[in-house]
Amino acid sequence: NMTDEEYFKRGQYTKQNGKMTTLTTDVALNYSKTWNEKHVLFANTQWSLGETKSESVTFQAEGFANDKLDYITHAQQYLEGGKPSGSESVSRETSILASVNYSYDSRYLFDGNYRANASSLFGADKRWGHFWSLGIGWNIHNESFMQDFGWLQRLKLRASTGYTGSQNFNSYQAISTYKYYSDEVYDNIIGSYLMSLANPDLQWQKTQDNNVGLDLSIFGRVDLTFDYYIKNTSNLLTPVTLPPSAGFSSYTENLGKSQNKGFELQASVRAINNSDQDLHLNVFASLMHNTNKIKEINEALSSMNDSKDSDKGLNYDQNTKEKTTKPSVRYAEGQSMSAIWAVRSLGIDPGTGNELFLTKDGYLTYTWDSDDQIVCGDELPKYTGTFGFNLDWKGFSVNTSFYYRLGGQMYNQTLVDKVENCDMNYNVDHRVYTGRWTTPGQKAEFKKMTDPNYFTRPTSRFVQDLSELQMTSLNIGYDFRNCKFMQKGIIERLKLSFYMNDVFRLSTVKTERGTDYPFARSFSFQLQATF
């Protein structure tokens, strides 16, 4: 039975209001000139100033007479013991830009750019970043000695080098922030506590992008683009995870230097272009390869690696706020930023049912040791790309897009959590009983339940090669343009189409995909009519 006071407090209502305001000012000055019908010059200078402000306020009320009176004004009172909460953030940025573009006879091209940016997101003495770029190009197909090659429509060589900056993090990462307790007063002073650590040395992440490329068009059907790049990043912006004892979950710091290099190849072919038969088919594909290497780390990052060694393979998960046996992110010079660190495993010992490990020095042991972790894989794929086609025939159209990745590895945490580290008080995977070691001499995929290393720490046994193929989109349609009733002039255009994304996925690794984006499959039908 409820008391009168409890009865009139039934039901709660939470209301949140938020808004974001962006103000920008841009002033630009352009100059262009053409002379002797061969020289083309364009120059530009620009100044910009901007501010982005966001704020949100949340409050709760309670006490509703019935579920029909569900607007907040029908509440009896604010939530007992509750008070309004919210957040706000402000970021400001200004920049100065100057650029020059020059072309001679549509054959030789030159680009130069300089940009100075200042952002309030960085430390007080590190707010300005200076970036420049230079590029050259040569349209070989416009040379006189190439005019006899009628099958060649475009042949262009290009090269560029320059710097870009990144500030991809939230406001107030460079300064200390506090929360005040308006209801806690001592000696007429309200209480407060430190919410985040200051980092006055936080500065722009800079990437030097060196690129050479080729553009080719031949036979009026085939287009090819090739790029080779080397990207050197300094002052690498990285969120550093802290142990719970620090009082903060993470902070942002410039932690070192890294290098990415690789190539990108894109091709498209107009395979069929028959207007008489109203048949058109375009095919496209791309291939990308990238390698990543850490060139330098600072002392803070090195200390963070040491602290993870002391965690004995149990890491702090930022999302669940709990300990996890997922391989921790570690940074080591000469290694990839996406390297998978684990202890090498020789599998399950048929005689004992325990996992047999290989130490860093090559000795056999049944004991998992954090000091024996080495790089056992890399999440970065060796090759990635897309392909697909666009077909149109007498009003029918089919457009498809596929994504593929070849090579690289992943740590199959699903097997770890659902089989070896499962909670026996709940429903479990059948492999907990069918796949584990039970009797001497048995060859098993999973260790025995009474293994002294109860929790399975990062081990190469769960590092698996990952290749996959996804059909990312399918669009089927019919345009009624050729139908007789369209000739009456009442309807100008009528088209029916069906769209589906994430059609299927084939993978060499079986694991839980979850329900979060980007794995939300959607279907849509559309009817377009123009009268």
Locations of regions flagged by a protein language model:
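Flexible glycine-rich, low-complexity coil/linker segments exposed to the extracellular/periplasmic environment
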Residues: M2-Q12, L69-S89, S182-M195, D311-C376, ...
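Transmembrane alpha-helix/helix-exit interface in multi-pass inner-membrane proteins
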Residues: S401-Y403
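Extra-cytoplasmic beta-strand recognition segments
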Residues: G385
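Extracellular/periplasmic, surface-exposed regions of secreted and cell-surface proteins
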Residues: N1-T3, Y7-T320, P458-F531
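Gram-negative outer-membrane beta-barrel transporters
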Residues: G256-P381, R405-G408, T414
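Extracytoplasmic gating/loop element in the C-terminal half of outer-membrane beta-barrel translocons
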Residues: S119, P350, R405-L494, M500
